[in-house]
């Protein structure tokens, strides 16, 4: 027994000695010093970071850690996931930053309701009554307003596209290159160093400029741009273990002059730079190499191809100026290494979804019920067990956003493992989409001024308008010389479409050149009740079938002098401008795939309507009506020129005695005084046309500068009397008109000035307008 115990003790001593020997052998060659790179914030100027990284790779400088703030966190985060400097330069230059900053979506993805609102309202504010009441109880009555101009959707999904393989929560030390970034907790005002979690969300938080981008909720913090507290976080590199620190600073220190800060991001960037100067000085002092590339002439929003290329080159040149000290560091590192220095990634490179589709074996839609999930998948054309590309996923997200029902939609892809797909081993993924419903109600405001009608204000309250289905109520009022009011109740069903009932009131005061006489003041008021269904809910195609009851009263008619005109004495007699009541079943079909509401470059907009008008008082016979309009937009080779052919045609198949059914042309705004009114350049006011009226028009538009346009117009009018006696201006003749317009597409709507002439009026006239048409 004693021998056994002695043997075991001896064996343990030998094992311990061997372990100690191995431990001593490992420590004989200590690891080489670690190199960290810190990248400051600075918006588009951060492109200079790419040039520095490119030079470091060219000379063989290893990068063991990367930290960044704001734009530095984006460049640094992508570099840490394995993207090369050349790939980064291409990515940054090709990104449509105006789309991401504006959080815009293509018009083609918008629903008809959202398109209509965006084309008439300058301001739209979603809200909820519960939210207002809760905030009122808390003493804050305005916090239901949006927290920023841009929410999470566009940017976070851009980062998700670039981070496939690293979208899940993780330790950032497990990235190909260990990474960290800085954000600011707006609840405490303190710095938050992000070293774990979701990489895309971390980058999004670090560059969330207050007031421009919405804050990000992350691990109990409400995070905004890290530049508010630490725009050059070299100290964070020290905490991570970097022994040698290379800093790249593209902030505007000592370079801001009068008139240089023009945009909101640049103003905020200037304030941030001044606020964090003291900490930046401390962080600059701990850098072994401090690089400040020349950013003269460029600002936070300089995201043009030329600007990006120049800034990348300037960053490269600045690093090249430090070749000697950088090479000394490299030589020192080589002396501490067992072999030559090479770029080593600790894990595989992130996958760019734009480069290749992924095979999706399952789809999960969060924060939606089963019925809505089925409808959303069908609406977005998403299917399981198929390859989905970046375009497929983001198009679906745009379509979902285009409904107006969601404030935030993000996605992530989770690896499920390898599976055999069509005889080939493929990584399969689960696509998870996260939906954050927006506030259900919306308040809209539109403003307009023009020389025909004067000032106008459009107010709208949409109750439950932002919901996908259920009962919705819309109240709209136009306050102007010609007031209008509409109330519409709609029941929306995801599968069956919309069923609506509406009441409209309008009071019109306008001038008309009746029967080839001088301008005459006319006035009428109208009450209209409608019930209709829209059974199909397609993005570009819509159809409506229903019935309306219209009561029209001509309240005042300026007397005519027709003492020597027996024909027109008869036409202007008691019938034409007397009160009338019409019952009108109708069908309306439209197709609209224009790329923009105003100043479109591509697409068509066409409407077909068929109506039957019954005089409920029995004084007139049934009047059938056909209406057709077409607008096309053609921009050859994406040039500055856009050709816009237009057709307007309407036929009433019995000569009506009611003036409100006659064909009407004139003015620049379609349907201004009557639903059937055609626009015509050269006839400033309105006039009545035959039973068959056709306007052919062609606009040639040239874009001078961004948002500045000049348009030349030629149109002609042909009318023919098919039924009954002639009561129109045209008398089977053709009249033409020409116009020249200058316009600026402002944030409150177009601002335009039009000069026009026609051979009917034989007079020049001018028309000026500001704001959207409504």
Which residues does each PLM region occupy?
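Positively charged n-region of N-terminal signal peptides that target proteins for export
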Residues: 1-4, 19-20
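C-terminal hydrophobic structural anchor segments
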Residues: 701-735
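Patatin-like phospholipase
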Residues: 19-69, 77-398, 402-415, 435-438
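Buried hydrophobic packing residues in well-ordered domains
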Residues: 42, 72, 88, 189, ...
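C-terminal outer-membrane beta-barrel translocator/porin domains of Gram-negative envelope proteins
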Residues: 442-447, 575, 585-705
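Short glycine-rich beta-strand segments
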Residues: 506-508, 550-552, 609-615, 650-654, ...
């Amino acid at each position: 027994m004693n021998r056994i115990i002695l043997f075991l003790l001896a064996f343990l001593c030998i094992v311990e000695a061997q372990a100690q020997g191995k431990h001593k052998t490992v420590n004989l060659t200590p690891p080489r010093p670690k190199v960290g790179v810190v990248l400051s914030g600075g918006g588009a100027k951060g492109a200079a970071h790419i040039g520095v990284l490119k030079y470091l790779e060219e000379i063989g400088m290893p990068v063991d850690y990367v930290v960044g703030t704001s734009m530095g966190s984006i460049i640094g985060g992508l570099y840490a996931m394995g993207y090369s400097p050349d790939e980064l330069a291409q990515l940054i230059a090709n990104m449509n930053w105006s789309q991401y900053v504006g959080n815009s979506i293509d018009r083609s993805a918008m629903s008809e309701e959202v398109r209509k609102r965006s084309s008439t309202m300058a301001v739209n504010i979603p809200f909820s009554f519960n939210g207002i009441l809760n905030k009122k109880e808390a003493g804050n009555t305005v916090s239901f307003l949006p927290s920023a101009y841009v929410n999470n959707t566009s940017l976070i999904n851009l980062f998700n596209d670039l981070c496939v393989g690293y979208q899940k929560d993780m330790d950032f030390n497990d990235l190909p290159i260990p990474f960290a970034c800085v954000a600011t907790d707006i609840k405490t005002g303190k710095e938050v160093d992000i070293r774990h979690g979701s990489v895309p969300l971390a980058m999004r938080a670090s560059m969330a400029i207050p007031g421009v981008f919405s804050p990000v909720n992350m691990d109990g913090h409400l995070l905004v741009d890290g530049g508010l507290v630490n725009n050059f976080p070299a100290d964070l590199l020290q905490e991570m273990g970097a022994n040698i620190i290379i800093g790249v600073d593209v902030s505007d220190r000592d370079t801001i002059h009068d008139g240089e800060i023009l945009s909101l991001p640049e103003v905020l960037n200037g304030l941030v730079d001044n606020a964090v100067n003291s900490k930046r000085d401390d962080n600059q002092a701990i850098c072994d190499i401090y690089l400040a590339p020349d950013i003269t002439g460029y600002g936070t929003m300089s995201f043009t191809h030329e600007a990006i290329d120049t800034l990348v080159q300037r960053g490269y040149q600045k690093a090249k100026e430090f070749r000697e000290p950088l090479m000394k560091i490299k030589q020192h590192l080589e002396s501490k290494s067992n072999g030559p220095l090479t770029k080593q990634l600790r894990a595989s490179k992130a996958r760019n979804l734009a480069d290749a589709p992924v095979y999706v074996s399952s789809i999960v839609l969060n924060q939606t019920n089963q019925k809505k999930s089925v409808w959303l998948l069908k609406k977005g054309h998403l299917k399981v067990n198929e390859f989905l590309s970046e375009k497929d996923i983001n198009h679906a997200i745009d379509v979902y956003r285009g409904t107006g029902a969601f404030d935030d939609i993000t996605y992530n892809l989770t690896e499920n493992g390898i599976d055999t797909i069509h005889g080939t081993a493929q990584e399969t993924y689960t696509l998870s989409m996260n939906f954050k419903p927006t506030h259900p109600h919306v308040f809209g405001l539109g403003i307009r001024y023009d020389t025909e009608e004067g000032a106008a204000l459009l107010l709208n309250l949409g109750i439950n308008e932002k919901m996908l289905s259920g009962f919705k109520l819309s109240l709209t009022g136009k306050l102007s010389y010609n007031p209008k009011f509409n109330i519409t109740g709609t029941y929306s069903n995801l599968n069956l479409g919309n069923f609506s009932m509406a009441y409209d009131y309008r009071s019109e005061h306008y001038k008309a050149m009746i029967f080839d006489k001088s301008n005459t003041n006319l006035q009428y008021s109208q009450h209209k009740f409608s019930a209709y269904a829209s059974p199909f809910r397609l993005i570009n195609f819509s159809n409506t079938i229903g019935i309306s009851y219209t009561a029209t009263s001509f309240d005042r008619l300026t007397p005519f002098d027709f003492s020597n005109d027996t024909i027109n004495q008869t036409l202007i007699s008691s019938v034409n401008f007397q009160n009338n009541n019409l019952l009108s079943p109708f069908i309306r079909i439209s197709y609209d795939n224009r790329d923009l509401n105003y100043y479109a470059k591509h697409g068509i907009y066409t409407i077909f309507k068929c109506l039957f008008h019954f005089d409920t008082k029995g004084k007139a016979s049934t009047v059938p009506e056909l209406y057709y309009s077409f607008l096309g937009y053609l921009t050859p080779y994406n040039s500055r020129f856009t050709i816009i052919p237009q057709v307007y045609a309407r036929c009433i198949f019995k000569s009506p005695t009611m003036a409100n059914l006659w064909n009407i042309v004139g003015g620049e705004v379609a349907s201004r005084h009557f639903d059937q009114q055609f626009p015509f350049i050269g006839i400033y006011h309105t006039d009545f046309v035959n039973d068959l009226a056709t306007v052919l028009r062609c606009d040639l538009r040239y874009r001078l500068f961004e948002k500045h346009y000049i348009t030349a117009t030629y149109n002609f009018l042909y009318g023919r009397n098919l039924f009954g006696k002639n009561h129109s201006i045209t008398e089977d003749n053709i009249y033409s008109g020409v116009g020249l317009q200058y316009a600026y597409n402002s944030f409150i709507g177009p601002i335009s000035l039009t000069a026009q002439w026609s051979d009917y009026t034989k007079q020049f006239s001018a028309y000026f307008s500001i704001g959207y048409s409504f």
